[in-house]
Swiss-Prot record:
UniProt keywords, alphabetically: Chromatin regulator, DNA-binding, Isopeptide bond, Metal-binding, Nucleus, Repeat, Transcription, Transcription regulation, Ubl conjugation, Zinc, Zinc-finger
Chief subcellular location: nucleus
Gene name in the database record: Znf518b
Species in which this protein is naturally found: Mus musculus
GO CC annotation terms, alphabetical: nucleus
Biased composition range(s): Polar residues: 9-30, 605-621, 675-688
Residue ranges of the region described as Disordered: 9-35, 372-397, 561-585, 599-622, 675-739, 825-852, 895-914
Residues in the signal sequence: none
Bias (Basic and acidic residues): 564-574
Cysteines joined through disulfide linkages: none
Cross-link (Glycyl lysine isopeptide (Lys-Gly) (interchain with G-Cter in SUMO2)): 479, 847, 861
Name of the protein this chain belongs to: Zinc finger protein 518B
Its biological purpose: Through its association with the EHMT1-EHMT2/G9A and PRC2/EED-EZH2 histone methyltransferase complexes may function in gene silencing, regulating repressive post-translational methylation of histone tails at promoters of target genes.
Length: 1077
């Protein structure tokens, strides 16, 4: 009956004026059906009806039917194979029967007059092969006619008809793609940005391409979920960025914002334009289309780089904004979409009848680094003072996120990432909100780098600040690339003296290298700074004069929080500080985590604004605040020319369960020994410091260069030379709001001349300053318990090498910054390259004894002594702060280097401890390899560099780490002493040797050799079991190391120990052989 109906209506419908026109695909149909018919004839033998039946596609609905060939006969006005299915010919069948889409949103009603715009053959065959069948509705192709038939019949059953325009699609993907044109909603969305797609695999590819550089993802949306309550803030801040919006609105919004954060006041200050990640919340389902796509430089990304900037839409004023629409928007003049950002539609708002698109600017790449802010272009608006506004304009443009961290807190640096911690801190410190924070967003992007900070401008800034009460002060972000933004803390009361913070911290970031590059020169010239204002910027210069010392002490007061991101800037600052020494140039390009300290000047009278009773010393200050939080560790960038290649330590240090316990014991020992107060304080700090050893290790190499500069000028050289030393490794970069960076300044390198330094050392807890480790310097290798990989000179414990020769490394100033608070990241202070302590002492031996008494309890660490040409070591030594007023004698310093090789483990063990000598005589030899062909190995000369291939004294993480360190300084290791602390850590104590036996002499050599053979017991027809031999007689189960003679009870340990020897011994054979060739 169906067939008859189809035949009856075919001619009628096709001849009539029906709106259902023939498909444009029709021309392809002729060839296709001929091919199909030809193929079906081939299969006549297998199918009885193949000769009479064929497959035809309805020209109206594109459904495929199996029909007799005679049905395709030509009707009036028809081409031969034109076929209209029964349903289409009847035209009475409601569209619901065709409509298979489950989308509830799609309506099932359509105008009969509308034509069904069948898909034009979208799936044209690109690589046509004669033997294949190709589906014209999708990408399906097959050589099997049966499969093809099944497939085409499926298309008849499954169809999607658009409720908006009656478009018919045969695949879900195509239907969804079509629906997006009407609804603007993509079925799949990127969780990190507003990218939408019709297939999930597109989202996956997008995420890998855009958000997962180097495995770092940006959890913007998830973060947003964490702080639902603050959703209004970003909008307000966005409005701030909007050029047209009236100023009054800003201020109201600002006050709301501030009250929300319970900031103490400062309504006139620029609010935090830190747009929170929650920005995501506002985004509606409007399709987010990148309006501007530009590739980003990887360095410019900031975690919160996705800021919202509001712009007013001019062109489609009435119609809804659709994905493909060109938009004309009015943006603030300052708004510049940085080259590395995508602008995406976040939201569409209607304000006063005008549509406002909320565009989100986000960097294409996210380096896991938390750059606190890079202002949302345009967001920063100065609410007061022309000067401030001018300064800010410069900053405004470039970064995608512009957070003016205007918390009001002088010290408070608002890390975008740490907003809520910031809030807490602000609550705490509401009282010292007074000082005006100059926060410089990293505006390094533009060439707008006019160095805003010229010395003149600094003075002006200071002047302006002193004039206006802090409230009036806009936070003028200083725009030079050089991230040095000036922080002037303005005394709250007009009468109070103004303490200017020249603080690099304020600058929160010049993370991008670019900024560093161009602005390195723009850093404040140290000379220009008023003497009162110690430039605490990068390394704050060490004040050398007495007054400076006082200032220094005051500096300890932690005023500004630094965002950890500012690594680069400080570097730049510092480089400037260095006095434009040539070295600086290299520094600038390096990324560097940096702690900025705000140096305060002496006149800082405690003002009501300041925290009442805030202690001057950094230690007490620490009590008040939670410790700095290090948001991340940045890897060193490659090109440091001045750093010896060996110095790049990897920060992964093996952790041992006993580390914490050991740290406590050590601290107690140090304190109990009655060391100078500063030392004890440092040791206490060290405790906390040990916890984050990793952070510093990476930062150091960069800083290192600076140090060398200062050393060269031994005298009370002008600040610049000293300044570089001060480069804090910033382990601390305190990202969140929180931290004082107690003083960064490390008294360390004050030339020996200044005896005064001494005071400073005792009084202040200096911040560790990573410095160039001169090859001749004595460095401490910390045990793994405290970061074995990191070489630090520490002032905690004067290093006395326990040799009869009483060589002492001298106290190396290890100026750790006091880590305050649990959060504080351990600053592993990398202390300045310790100059050789020897220089400090007039008479080496007496001093060593004294030190020994002080430190004997304190464990001694392994100290590799590095020597280069003697001259270099000497020069290096000079910069040392003298912890005790000792005159420097270069000759003595040489003596230290000249310690005899015998002291390397060959020294009589009795000298180290009173254990039975037999064990040590067996196991105490170091195998040396000459660095140069003419060097002596058996009896190395005093200053001859030697490469230690194996250190068989002990097999442990401590010694392994020491060996790694030694290996890195291959040509420069003069002496290796295993300290008492290390030995204690190893458990090698009197009469108790780990894994070894004291009665070595009694062990029978033959029996030991026999033990190398395994004894097997046959436990089954095909099974043997290893039988432990003579378990009752442990003395017979001892294995002697073939390399060093060490004895092991466990055969497995003995084997692994031997393998390590082999690895060490053959490590550089390929290099040596290649050199020989």
């Amino acid at each position: 009956m169906k067939d008859i109906g189809e035949q009856l209506y075919t001619t009628q419908v096709n001849g009539g004026p029906s709106s259902l026109t023939m498909s444009p695909k029709q021309p392809n149909r002729a060839t296709r059906t001929e091919r199909q018919e030809a193929q079906t004839l081939l299969y006549q033998g297998s199918e009885a009806e193949a000769a009479t039946m064929t497959i035809a596609t309805c020209v109206q609905c594109k459904s495929v039917h199996k029909i007799p060939t005679q049905d395709l006969r030509k009707g009036p006005g028809q081409s031969q194979d034109t076929y209209v299915c029964f349903k289409c010919s009847l035209r009475a069948v409601p569209t619901q029967l065709h409509f298979v889409n489950n989308n509830a949103g799609a309506a099932h009603v359509r105008n009969e007059t509308e034509t069904i715009s069948s898909p034009v053959n979208k799936f044209k065959v690109r690589n046509f092969k004669p033997g294949k069948y190709y589906c014209d509705k999708c990408r399906f192709s097959t050589k099997d006619p049966l499969q093809y038939r099944k497939h085409t019949l499926q298309h008849e059953e499954i169809r999607f008809i658009c409720s908006h325009c009656s478009y018919i699609s045969y695949t879900k993907g195509e239907f969804q793609r079509h629906l997006v044109k009407h609804t603007g909603i993509f079925p799949y969305r990127c969780e990190y940005c507003d990218y939408g797609a019709i297939r999930n695999d597109y989202i996956v590819k997008h995420r890998r391409r855009v958000h997962e550089r180097a495995g770092a993802k940006r959890p913007f949306k998830t973060v947003a979920k964490l702080e639902p309550k603050r959703t209004s803030i970003p909008k307000q801040s966005m409005e701030l960025s909007k050029g047209p919006s009236p100023r009054a609105a800003f201020q109201n919004k600002l006050s709301d914002q501030l009250s929300r954060f319970s900031l103490h006041a400062n309504k006139d200050k620029t609010h935090n334009l830190m747009l929170l990640p929650e920005l995501k919340k506002y985004q509606k389902d409007v399709v987010c289309i990148p309006n501007k796509v530009t590739l980003s430089e990887p360095r410019e990304v900031s975690l919160l780089g996705n800021k919202n900037v509001e712009v007013e839409v001019l062109s489609p004023s009435k119609e809804p904004v659709h994905p493909g629409m060109p938009l004309t928007v009015m943006a603030p003049s300052e708004l510049v979409v940085p080259t590395n950002c995508l602008a995406q539609l976040m939201d569409v708002k209607v304000v006063n009848g005008a549509q406002q698109l909320v565009l989100k600017l986000f960097p294409l790449e996210e380096n896991a680094r938390l750059e606190t802010s890079r202002g949302d272009g345009g967001t920063s608006e100065c609410l007061s003072t022309e000067k401030g506004s001018g300064g800010q304009k410069k900053m405004l443009s470039p970064e995608a996120s512009r957070s003016l961290a205007v918390e009001g807190n002088a010290g408070d640096f608002v890390g975008l990432d740490r907003l809520h911690s910031l809030v807490q801190k602000q609550l705490k410190n509401v009282k010292w909100v007074k000082s005006c924070n100059f926060f410089m967003p990293n505006s390094g992007v533009h060439s707008q780098q006019e160095s805003f900070l010229g010395s003149d401008t600094i003075k002006e800034l200071q002047k302006s600040h002193s004039l206006c009460p802090p409230r009036a002060l806009p936070s003028a972000a200083i725009k030079s690339h050089s991230p040095a933004s000036v922080q002037n803390s303005v005394p709250y009361g007009p009468g109070a003296t103004v303490s200017h913070f020249l603080s690099k911290a304020a600058v929160a970031f010049a993370d991008d290298r670019r900024g560093a590059r161009s602005n390195s020169q723009q850093l404040l010239p140290l000379a220009s700074l008023p003497s009162k204002v110690p430039f605490s910027g990068e390394k704050g210069l060490l004040p050398i004069g007495e007054s400076d010392l006082e200032a220094r002490n005051r500096i300890s007061r932690p005023e500004t929080l630094v965002s950890s991101d500012r690594k680069l800037e400080d570097k730049q600052m510092e480089s400037k500080a260095v006095g434009n020494t040539g070295q600086v140039s290299s520094v600038q390009n390096k990324e560097y985590l940096h702690i900025n300290i705000t140096g305060e000047d002496k006149p800082r009278s405690q003002q009501p604004g300041d925290q009442p009773g805030q202690p001057k010393t950094s230690e007490t200050a620490g009590a008040t605040f939670e410790g700095p939080i290090i948001s991340s560790v940045f890897s060193l960038s490659s090109g440091s020319e001045n750093v010896p290649e060996a110095i790049k330590w990897n920060s992964s240090t093996t952790k041992i369960k006993s580390i914490e316990l050991l740290r406590r014991k050590i601290a107690q020992l140090i304190e109990s020994c009655g060391k100078p107060s500063s030392l004890s304080a440092n040791s206490a700090q060290r405790r906390s410091i040990g916890q984050a050893p990793k952070l510093t290790s990476k930062a150091t190499p960069k800083a290192i260069q600076e140090m060398s500069v200062s050393l060269t000028g031994p005298g009370p050289t002008p600040g610049p030379s000293v300044g570089p030393l001060q480069k804090p490794p910033n382990e601390d970069s305190i990202t969140g709001s929180r931290q004082l960076v107690p003083q960064q300044v490390c008294p360390q390198f004050i030339s020996a001349n200044d005896g005064k330094m001494e005071n400073r050392v005792t009084r202040k807890t200096p911040v560790a300053t990573p410095v160039l480790i001169p090859k001749g310097a004595v460095l401490r290798v910390l045990n793994s318990s405290e970061d074995a990989h990191i070489i630090e000179a520490t002032c905690d414990t004067p290093v006395s090498i326990p040799c009869s020769e009483a060589q002492l490394a001298g106290t190396l100033p290890f100026c750790p910054m006091k880590q305050t608070g649990s959060g504080s990241q351990p600053l592993t202070c990398r202390s300045g390259p310790a100059d050789m302590s020897p220089g400090l002492e007039t008479s080496l031996r007496p001093k060593s004894r004294k030190e020994d008494t002080i430190c004997s309890a304190t464990a001694k660490k392994m100290v590799p002594v590095y020597s280069t040409a003697p001259g270099s070591s000497d020069s290096i030594r000079q910069g040392r702060p003298v912890s005790r007023n000792l005159t420097v004698s270069k000759n003595k310093t040489k003596q230290v280097n000249s310690t005899k090789k015998k002291n390397k483990m060959q020294a009589n063990p009795g000298r180290y401890f009173k254990d039975p000598p037999s064990f040590f005589q067996v196991a105490r030899q170091l195998r040396l390899i000459a660095a140069k062909p003419d060097q002596l190995i058996k009896c190395p000369r005093r200053n001859q560099p030697v490469i230690v291939l194996n250190h068989p004294d002990v097999d442990s993480p401590e010694v392994t780490n020491v060996m790694k360190v030694i290996n890195k300084y291959k040509g420069n290791v003069l002496k290796v002493v295993l300290s008492e602390r290390t030995r204690c850590q190893l458990g090698v104590r009197r009469y108790h040797m780990r894994l070894t036996y004291q009665n070595v002499a009694e062990t029978n050599h033959m029996k030991r050799q026999m033990m190398l053979k395994m004894k097997l017991k046959k436990v089954h027809k095909n099974n043997y079991q290893v039988v432990g031999s003579m378990p009752d007689d442990p003395a017979q189960c001892v294995f002697k190391c073939w390399f060093c003679g060490r004895l092991y009870e466990d055969q497995e340990e003995w084997m692994s120990h031997g393998q390590r020897h082999l690895i060490e011994a053959t490590r550089d054979w390929d290099v040596l052989s290649s050199k020989g060739k």
